[in-house]
Amino acid sequence: MTTQEDTTGLHQKTSLWTMSRPGAKKVMNSYFIAGCGPAVCYYAVSWLRQGFSINLTSFGRIPWPHAGVGTCPSPQSWISPFLQSHREHHYAKTSSHSQPSPQSLALCLAYSRCSINICQMTECISLASGCHQALREPGRSEESFWIPATPYISNIFSES
């Protein structure tokens, strides 16, 4: 799949998997930097009673506008901020900032210690990307797409 380069030369490929087991999702984000080679972030998403947890492992150096070049520590974990306070504090050491979107708790933005803006894919985004309509084998759906990487993921996705 082809894309147009943005001013940074950084592109993001997102792959979503929705497994047959209720609440199980995996998200892989791949970043390709023109002239610098690939960098990959893997997300493991677990849905909890009161929210969701996300574990992130990244490889390679990912340059980001306004932040220079940084390497994400591995692994990192976030708990969505609408969980209980004591659980938020438990994960405060691995995430410098996490907040819900203004209109919905379905989309969260997390900022890693290396100042890389990471989109936490949730069910809202999965539905918007059509992954549930793209079943390729029983119990599993998969959707991959390339987008220009931008500092604010909310500029890319709109809530339905």
Curated annotation (Swiss-Prot):
Keywords: Membrane, Transmembrane, Transmembrane helix. It is found in: Membrane. It comes from the Eukaryota. The keyword Transmembrane applies. Its main location: membrane. It is a single-pass membrane protein. The lineage of its organism: Eukaryota, Metazoa, Chordata, Craniata, Vertebrata. This is Putative uncharacterized protein YWHAH-AS1. GO terms for cellular component: membrane. The chain crosses the membrane at residues 27-47.
